[in-house]
């Protein structure tokens, strides 16, 4: 898929920015201090007898410790502050999960079941610079906790998406460390909204491979130090230069590094763009993004699965 025509892209970004403008008020409450998780990782007050037994390694929500190729991940993307931010924010978290499960069902195969995921905007690029001048608003911890609880009820993953504005990807990731220590929480980087020197939405952002690698190694260390199952690590891309030096992106043990072909348009252009960005074969896991409102003729699941190579991750916005 070619990048959308300039006028369509501008209209889309204006709509997104109108929604992002509503989020400035979040910055006043984004510093809420709460604990991560809901206690599901086990009781720390074990008896001395229990402590002599090696604990069973924690698994993914639907079993096992490896995401790909054991599962195909189908995700909803968005945030609750506005439906313009994506499908995940429409209705309550549980309502979004029910719609996601219905959408994901056609992708499930006997040899490759579906693992649902909620891709929640944890950092939202903002047209308002905010008090720190970084043009991004951090999602309140109470919201992240609510979506994590909904994901766990559905045996799904939570994926925290970073739209950093003028902030640094690694710094924003470190802010999410308490969540990333959970076995069912992954991370996504959204370079379109990394725009140092410009207001988000007025230009298309990008990121260098070296910056992606800093984040990947940091998250991989969390996986290793906490003996976690494989963690989903997504980088969105819809222009060739959105990830500068892409060939140099590392794939540390413990991460399912996935390049998600982003961007809306008609089917021929989307398919062409997918082929362009997946020509390097099996080096990275592959993702494909669909837009309920912006795509011209939403592709059906059987058409998505017919892509070559078939995507490991399918995201709906």
Task: Indicate residue ranges for each PLM-predicted region.
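Active-site groove signature of glycoside hydrolases
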Residues: 182-202, 206, 233-234
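Structural preference for beta-strand elements that scaffold enzyme active sites
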Residues: 71-75, 113-119, 155-159, 184-188, ...
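N-terminal carbohydrate-binding/catalytic regions of secreted carbohydrate-active enzymes
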Residues: 76-148
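N-terminal export and membrane-targeting signals
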Residues: 2-24
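Active-site beta-loop-alpha junctions enriched in small/polar residues
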Residues: 79-81, 121-125, 163-165, 190-194, ...
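C-terminal region of N-terminal signal peptides and the immediate post-cleavage residues
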Residues: 29-51
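Surface-exposed substrate-engagement region within the catalytic domains
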Residues: 203-316
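Distinct, well-ordered alpha-helical segments
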Residues: 168-180, 243-249
């Amino acid at each position: 898929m070619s990048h959308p025509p300039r006028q369509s892209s501008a209209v889309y970004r204006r709509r997104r920015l109108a929604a992002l403008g509503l989020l400035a008020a979040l910055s006043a409450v984004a510093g809420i201090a709460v604990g991560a998780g809901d206690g599901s990782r086990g009781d720390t007050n074990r008896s001395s007898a229990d402590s002599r037994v090696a604990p069973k390694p924690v698994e993914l929500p639907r079993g096992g410790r490896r995401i790909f190729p054991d599962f195909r991940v189908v995700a909803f993307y968005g945030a609750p502050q506005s439906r313009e931010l994506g499908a995940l924010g429409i209705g309550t978290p549980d309502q979004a999960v029910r719609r996601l499960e219905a959408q994901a069902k056609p992708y499930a195969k006997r040899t490759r079941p579906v693992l649902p995921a909620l891709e929640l905007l944890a950092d939202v690029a903002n047209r308002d610079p905010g008090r720190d001048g970084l043009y991004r608003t951090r999602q309140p911890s109470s919201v992240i906790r609510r979506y994590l609880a909904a994901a766990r009820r559905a045996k799904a993953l939570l994926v925290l998406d970073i739209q950093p504005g003028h902030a640094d990807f690694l710094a924003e990731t470190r802010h999410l460390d308490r969540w990333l220590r959970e076995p069912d929480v992954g991370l996504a980087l959204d370079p379109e909204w990394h725009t140092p020197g410009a207001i988000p939405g007025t230009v298309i952002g990008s990121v260098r491979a070296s910056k992606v690698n800093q984040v990947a190694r940091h998250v991989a260390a969390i996986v290793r130090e906490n003996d976690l199952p494989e963690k989903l690590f997504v980088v969105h891309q819809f222009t060739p230069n959105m990830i500068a030096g892409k060939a140099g992106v590392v794939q540390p043990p413990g991460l399912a590094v996935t390049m998600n072909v982003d961007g809306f348009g008609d089917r021929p252009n989307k398919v062409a763009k997918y082929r362009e960005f997946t020509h390097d074969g099996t080096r990275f896991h592959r993702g494909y993004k669909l837009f309920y409102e912006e795509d011209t003729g939403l592709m059906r699941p059987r058409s998505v699965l017919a892509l070559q190579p078939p995507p490991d991750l399918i995201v709906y916005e």
